[in-house]
């Protein structure tokens, strides 16, 4: 209000009854509250102080309903402008009109008289900050630069009041959770924090801390059929051998047979002989120390321009790079293998030469160094290799040909090809395609890759060599490049990168916290968010470790930090926004009511979003991968704890912040004003030039902040709602196609790229890293690696009986393998079993997948026909007449043998084979410690070659499975529990990742639907949210496929959490839509976007920054985590904002459609909970079409203005009138009938399709924002409009506030009705002249049930002539700009404020005043522009104990936004007592 305005009011004007809704109230006396100066003091002696005024509560309860009063009454009394301590009123001698006297002295200088009354006893202090209703008092020298720009339309001085109220202390029992939070915030916050801290401490101190030494542990499947069989087969091999529970031979027979002892010793003697022969071969050349092997460090070379490495230049380059890059460092000499050379009596130790192509060619040509090679020698060596390569590729040339050149396969190999150098070059040093079967005939074969084996074993000691000489250095020389390497330090280097790159996750977390701080302008809330996340994670670790008894803690569990920070970001933004919205009420409600309102809506949103996210995180529990299951349990528990804790720390933090911010601002404000409040205007600038720079910088920041705020308001209050609603057809089609395309890409073609290696060699660094290139590309290019992995080798099929396939270890601990379980029902000695096992041999050999043995292959590799071998062995044994055939297994025994004879003969045959060295290496029988047969293992080769192709391996597995199940069903009783296993570990991992990842995603979507249905009880909204979440998840997975991500355990873990990360944003819109104060779909959609658009976009933008920040990380875990968070949050934001809202535009629930109602709670829910489906029907006379909630009971209450409801805005108002005491006329009720009734319930008319050409659209740019924050204005009006409880309470316990007193561009005589002119008491000219300087506008709180289209106006009889006062244009505009913060944004909340048809033309200005009819548009409909700045009421209340004696019949004028446009006359006949 301008300082020059004059306050005019009746002498006997009444203050509103400040009774609360909790019970009856007593009209309390007005408190003497000292005025607080709004201007800086001139000196220290004139500093304004705020003195608390103690108000003693009545300690004695009375039976009278008017015996008690609350802090709510006190705060409302303090908030009224006329109740303040002010100078005495001047009384006009002519008309008796009173006006407050104006003083030139700041009110703050009058406080000294009251300072002595400040109480020193413990008291409760309530603060009320509301716009000042008093004229601003400023000194002549003002420090305007400290307050920023004072725009008349935006700036309103704020007056701080402090009231001290004594309460009953500990004897007062809180009635609700919000009351506990408001009265004891510090106690509640500290108590909950201590509980969580105690749990965290217990989790840390109980047992060992997590071990991250093996970051890749736990990414293998556990619990599947194949994994259980592979684990059992592994344990069977581990438990077989000397000194172990099982043995391949009966130990009783081996102890008696000396041949067995000699044979047992023959194997190590054979190895020693081979080692001596290899040493003798190397000693002839006197060059290499040993043979190359996979235990040595390896470097892969390739030509830069794809040229062949088989050239003298390339060979020189490889030798040179080895010398400069590897051997030049002093650390290499300490780690390399050393060979001793004797020079006379001296011994010289030097590093062994590397196994490189150049050195082998030097050996073949009998030269000392690779630098001495010539082109001719290189060509001759190529010819030798070309000649010997076919023998290598057909399997004839093997490593043993050097030792046994005349036996077995080596007999056909030429002598000059039996050199170890030929085999080692082809086997180790060159790629598989060099001189292969397809390229051996090429004239100039191409050598693409070549390996160099360093004489250093793989170990962590090579870490320094890599970091000092290889990482970050140029690895190219003469167009030859080192592109891959395997130094055995991949795991250690990964942990090194994790530690070095940890700065990126820290920066990402800080980005989320800074986003919270900047958005909410509170570092305290950001710090509390971090504390809440830490306590939630540590408490979840306590439950993870103590309650769930899980010992394995994978490294990726730490990624839950970003998930919880994002959850805290969403919770804090929505909660604090709504809290600030409650504070923007004029005046704000008491803290208890505000907190109760915020917890009802935002607490509900937090619970719905948090519970849904937590349960979807738990969906990863159904996965078979251990790390994914552990991550699901930990993240789900942490999210649940964080959700529950958010309902404690968020409200407590806001109460504490509000409580202590007032004290700090008052203390700091006085000190901050001293340097600049000098008598000399230039004193501020003369103090220091640094202050001018700081002031300029601060002004720039303010300007930037205001510009950003205006842009945000324009985007999220206008552009985004209009864009979503008007282009909903495009959005729903576009995102539907995006979801369908993502589903097709991720599930059908091409699908996620499955891993080509087991989990131990998973990708840890970027694809361009030399370690990753070796594992992904070069490992499959060399024959020694391919043979080690069994690639392109026939797969072995193993059939096992006697052992139960079980995994009785802890499935949540990869190190817990369990024990071996023996089948007690195993019996292979029965007659039926012997016959079935004999027939099984022929059945296997007749299968298409069986690979028969060649004549050159060792029969020990295949024991499928061991029964036939036993029959043959028994038949060739000759027994004498004195010998017992059954005891010595002679030829006189017919088959099938008696069970005891079968076991004895079988044991003897195995002992004889073992003595001869023909015992199968892996198959055969397993004997227990007593010599009995405990298990049977049958192994044979198949025609299927080992492959990484999932489809090929799946076809082979299904073929074997169907055949084996068919055969085992016909087996005798003792053999029916057999099972098979093969090299299916990679296939099992691929199968789990390809199927279970999609199953987890689908299950999480189903859980989303279930949880939303349980929390919202609305089927359509739950379905739409589930569709949006599913589309977001599959679109994200489709984008990951397009980014060529390989589906490993890490990726599966991320995808399992995708639904939980996507549901937050959709839940925000869903709850906001269901609580919107609109009955039509489009209005609810616009409301939810305006309310939640900014927090959702801010959260998505914060995660976008997180992804960008983590991109430079070398560790692939951080990079993928950042990319995944970026994609899933941005895609979820798009689907929530555009797809979900578009679905609601088309099929959003209304009129209770889809809502599950329980009969026992229907009545209560309709009274206390905001209904998401209005009962409004198109074409009915219902003001709810304009965006207001129903105020009464029931979900289908209609608020109309016809005689049926007796002309009341709310149903409860009728009952309220009935309770009024009889006396005088009822106050007149006036309203704008054409805007409130008979409007179509459509968002189209209120947004973009208004038929009124001159009226601006609700979402158009013609609307001018008023107030400090348009977004707060909009939110305040919309929140107040949707509170049915507050509306009901206001009508029951509050008095009607005063009517709006304003000016009109019409003349005085045009505003009064002739028949009422004689009844009015006219003010004198002096009073009228004083009133032209300004007007007193009552600033009262908007009722929560009122909206801009439901304006109820009452008028007292003694202020009638004030309506006839006219003002100048500039005075009129200042009034409109300085009114309460209920700005024209309230119109945006209305669904339908435009007119549906055009009335008659504008009447001429010369017509008499009789033609202007009250309650009608008076022919100005096409130019009507309303600027409803304040919802106004009459302060006089019949319930206050005094009855008004007269009522004015003059209609109320609602001013137009432009002075040249006509005002609107509105009038509605009030109902008397009888009529009500």
From Swiss-Prot:
Keywords: Glycoprotein, Membrane, Transmembrane, Transmembrane helix. Residues 60-83 have a biased composition (Polar residues). It is found in: Membrane. Residues 495-656 form the SSD domain. It is a multi-pass membrane protein. Gene3D superfamilies: Multidrug efflux transporter AcrB transmembrane domain. The chain crosses the membrane at residues 185-205, 506-526, 528-548, 550-570, 602-622, 635-655, 729-749, 1000-1020, 1023-1043, 1047-1067, 1098-1118, 1121-1141. InterPro entries: Dispatched_Hh_regulator, SSD. Glycans are attached at residues 58, 366, 478-479, 817, 827, 846, 1245, 1339, 1391. Residues 1-84, 1447-1476 are annotated as: Disordered. One of its GO terms (biological process) is smoothened signaling pathway. Residues 1465-1476 have a biased composition (Basic and acidic residues). One of its GO terms (cellular component) is membrane. Belongs to the dispatched family. PANTHER family: PROTEIN DISPATCHED HOMOLOG 2 (PTHR45951:SF2), PROTEIN DISPATCHED-RELATED (PTHR45951). This is Protein dispatched homolog 2. It comes from Danio rerio (Zebrafish). The gene is disp2.
């Amino acid at each position: 209000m301008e300082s020059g305005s004059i306050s005019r009011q009746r002498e006997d004007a009444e203050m509103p009854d400040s009774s609360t809704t909790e019970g009856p109230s007593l009209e309390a006396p007005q408190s003497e509250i000292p005025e607080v100066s709004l201007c800086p003091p001139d000196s220290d002696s004139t500093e304004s102080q705020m003195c608390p005024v103690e108000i003693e509560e009545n300690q004695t309860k009375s039976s009278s309903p008017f015996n008690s009063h609350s802090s709510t009454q006190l705060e409302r009394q303090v908030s009224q402008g006329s109740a303040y301590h002010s100078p005495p009123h001047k009384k006009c001698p002519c008309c008796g009109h009173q006006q407050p006297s104006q003083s030139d002295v700041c009110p703050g200088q009058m406080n000294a008289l009251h300072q002595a009354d400040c109480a020193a006893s413990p008291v409760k202090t309530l603060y009320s900050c509301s716009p000042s209703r008093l004229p601003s008092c400023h000194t002549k020298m003002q420090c305007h630069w400290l307050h920023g720009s004072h725009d008349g339309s935006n700036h309103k001085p704020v007056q701080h009041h402090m009231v001290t109220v004594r309460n009953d202390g500990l004897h007062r029992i809180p009635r609700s959770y919000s009351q506990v939070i408001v009265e004891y915030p510090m106690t509640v916050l500290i108590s909950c924090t201590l509980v969580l801290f105690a749990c965290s401490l217990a989790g840390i101190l109980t047992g060992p801390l997590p071990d991250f030494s093996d970051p890749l542990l736990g990414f293998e499947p556990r619990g599947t059929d194949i994994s259980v069989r592979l684990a059992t087969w592994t344990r069977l091999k581990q438990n077989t051998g000397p000194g172990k529970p099982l043995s391949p031979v009966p130990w009783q027979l081996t102890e008696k047979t000396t041949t067995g002892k000699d044979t047992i010793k023959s194997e190590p003697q054979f190895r020693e002989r081979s080692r001596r022969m290899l040493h003798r071969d190397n000693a002839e050349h006197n060059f290499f120390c040993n043979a190359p092997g996979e235990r040595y460090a390896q470097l892969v070379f390739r030509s830069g321009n794809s040229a062949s490495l088989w050239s003298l230049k390339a060979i020189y380059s490889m030798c040179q790079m080895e010398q400069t890059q590897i051997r030049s460092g002093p650390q290499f000499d300490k780690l390399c293998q050393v060979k001793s050379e004797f020079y006379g009596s001296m011994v010289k130790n030097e590093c062994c030469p590397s196994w490189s192509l150049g050195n082998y060619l030097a050996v073949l040509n009998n030269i000392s160094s690779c630098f001495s090679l010539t082109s001719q020698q290189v060509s001759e060596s190529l010819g030798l290799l070309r000649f010997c390569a076919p023998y290598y590729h057909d399997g004839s040339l093997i490593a043993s040909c050097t030792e046994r050149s005349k036996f077995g396969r080596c007999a056909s190999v030429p002598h000059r090809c039996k050199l170890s150098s030929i085999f080692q070059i082809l086997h180790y040093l060159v790629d598989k395609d060099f001189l292969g079967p397809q390229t051996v005939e090429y004239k100039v074969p191409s050598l693409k890759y070549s390996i160099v084996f360093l004489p250093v074993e793989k170990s962590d000691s090579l870490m320094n060599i890599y970091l000092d000489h290889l990482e970050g250095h140029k690895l190219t020389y003469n167009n030859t490049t080192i592109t891959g390497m395997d130094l055995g330090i991949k795991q250690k280097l990964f942990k090194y990168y994790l530690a070095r790159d940890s700065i990126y996750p820290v920066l990402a977390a800080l980005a989320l916290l800074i986003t919270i701080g900047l958005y909410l302008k509170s570092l305290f809330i950001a710090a509390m968010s971090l504390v809440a996340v830490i306590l939630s994670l540590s408490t979840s670790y306590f439950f993870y470790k103590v309650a769930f008894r899980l010992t394995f803690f994978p490294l990726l569990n730490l990624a839950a930090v970003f998930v919880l920070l994002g959850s805290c970001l969403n919770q804090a933004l929505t909660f604090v926004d709504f809290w600030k919205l409650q504070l923007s009420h004029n005046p704000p409600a008491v803290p208890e009511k505000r907190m109760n309102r915020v917890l009802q809506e935002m607490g509900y949103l937090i619970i719905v979003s948090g519970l849904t996210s937590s349960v979807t995180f738990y969906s990863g529990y159904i996965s078979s991968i251990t790390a994914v299951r552990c991550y699901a349990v930990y993240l789900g528990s942490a999210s649940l704890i964080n959700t529950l804790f958010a309902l404690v720390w968020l409200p407590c933090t806001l109460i504490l912040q509000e409580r202590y911010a007032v004290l700090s601002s008052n203390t700091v404000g006085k000190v901050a004003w001293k340097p600049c409040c000098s008598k000399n205007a230039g004193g501020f600038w003369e103090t220091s030039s640094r202050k001018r720079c700081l002031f300029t910088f601060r002004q720039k920041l303010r300007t930037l902040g205001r510009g950003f705020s205006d842009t945000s308001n324009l985007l999220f209050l206008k552009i985004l709602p209009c864009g979503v609603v008007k282009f909903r057809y495009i959005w729903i089609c576009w995102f539907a196609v995006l979801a369908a395309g993502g589903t097709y890409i991720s599930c059908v073609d091409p699908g996620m790229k499955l891993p080509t290696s087991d989990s131990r060699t998973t990708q840890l660094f970027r694809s361009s890293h030399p370690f990753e290139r070796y594992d992904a590309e070069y490992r499959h290019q060399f024959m020694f690696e391919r043979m080690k992995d069994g690639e392109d080798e026939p797969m072995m099929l193993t059939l096992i009986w006697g052992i139960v396939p079980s995994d009785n270890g802890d499935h949540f601990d990869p190190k817990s393998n369990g024990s071996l379980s023996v089948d007690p029902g195993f019996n292979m000695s029965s007659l039926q079993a012997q016959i079935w096992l004999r027939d099984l041999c022929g059945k296997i050999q007749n299968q298409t997948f069986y690979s028969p043995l060649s004549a050159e292959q060792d029969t020990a590799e295949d024991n499928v026909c061991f029964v036939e071998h036993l029959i043959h062995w028994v038949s060739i044994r000759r027994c004498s007449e004195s010998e017992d055939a059954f005891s010595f297994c002679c030829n006189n025994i017919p088959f099938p043998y008696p069970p005891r004879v079968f076991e004895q003969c079988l044991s003897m045959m195995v002992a004889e084979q073992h003595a001869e060295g023909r015992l199968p290496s892996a198959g055969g029988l397993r004997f227990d410690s007593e010599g009995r047969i405990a298990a049977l293992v049958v192994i044979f080769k198949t025609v299927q070659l080992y492959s990484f192709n999932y489809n090929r391996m799946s076809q082979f597995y299904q073929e074997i499975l169907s055949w084996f199940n068919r055969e085992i069903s016909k087996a005798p009783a003792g053999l029916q529990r057999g099972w098979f296993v093969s090299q299916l570990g990679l296939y099992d991992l691929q199968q789990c990742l390809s199927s279970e990842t999609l199953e987890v995603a689908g299950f999480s979507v189903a859980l989303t639907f279930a949880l939303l249905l349980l929390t919202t009880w609305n089927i359509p909204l739950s379905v739409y949210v589930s569709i949006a979440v599913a589309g977001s998840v599959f679109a994200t997975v489709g984008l990951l496929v397009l980014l060529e991500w390989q589906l490993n355990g890490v990726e599966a873990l991320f995808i399992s959490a995708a639904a939980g990360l996507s549901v937050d944003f959709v839940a925000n819109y869903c709850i906001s839509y269901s609580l919107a104060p609109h009955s039509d779909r489009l209005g609810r959609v616009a409301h939810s976007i305006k309310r939640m658009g900014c927090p959702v976009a801010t959260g998505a933008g914060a995660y976008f920054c997180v992804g960008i920040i983590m991109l430079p990380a070398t560790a692939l875990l951080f990079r993928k985590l950042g990319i995944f968070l970026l994609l899933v949050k941005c895609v979820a934001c798009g689907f929530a904002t555009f797809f979900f809202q578009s679905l609601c535009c088309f099929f959003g629930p209304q009129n209770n459609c889809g809502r599950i109602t329980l009969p026992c709670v229907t009545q209560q829910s309709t009274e206390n909970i905001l209904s998401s489906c209005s009962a409004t029907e198109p074409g009915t006379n219902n003001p709810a079409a304009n965006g207001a909630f129903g105020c009464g009971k029931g979900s289908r209450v209609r608020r109309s203005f016809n005689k049926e409801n007796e002309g009341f805005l709310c149903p409860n108002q009728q009952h309220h009138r009935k309770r009024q005491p009889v006396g005088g006329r009822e106050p007149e009720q006036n309203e704008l009938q054409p805007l409130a009734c008979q409007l179509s319930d459509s968002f189209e008319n209120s947004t973009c399709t208004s038929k009124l050409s001159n009226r601006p659209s609700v979402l158009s740019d013609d609307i001018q924002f008023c107030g400090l924050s348009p977004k707060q204005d909009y939110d305040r009006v919309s929140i107040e409009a949707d509170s049915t409880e507050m509306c009901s309470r206001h009508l029951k316990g509050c008095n009607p506030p005063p009517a709006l007193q304003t000016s009109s561009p019409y003349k005085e005589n045009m505003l009064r009705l002739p028949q009422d002119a004689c009844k009015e008491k006219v003010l004198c000219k002096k009073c009228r002249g004083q009133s032209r300087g300004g007007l007193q506008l009552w600033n009262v709180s908007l009722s929560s049930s009122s909206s801009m289209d439901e304006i109820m106006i009452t008028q007292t009889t003694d202020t009638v002539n004030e309506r006839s006062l006219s003002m100048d244009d500039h005075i009129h505009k200042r009034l409109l700009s300085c009114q309460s913060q209920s700005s024209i944004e309230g119109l945006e909340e209305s669904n339908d404020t435009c007119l549906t048809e055009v009335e008659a033309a504008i009447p001429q200005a010369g017509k008499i005043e009789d033609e202007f009819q009250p309650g009608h548009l008076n022919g100005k409909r096409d130019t009507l522009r309303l600027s409803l700045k304040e919802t106004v009421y009459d302060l006089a209340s019949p319930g206050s104990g005094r009855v008004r004696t007269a009522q004015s019949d003059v209609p109320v004028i609602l001013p137009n936004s432009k002075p040249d446009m006509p005002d609107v006359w509105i009038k509605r006949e009030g109902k008397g007592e009888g009529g009500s």
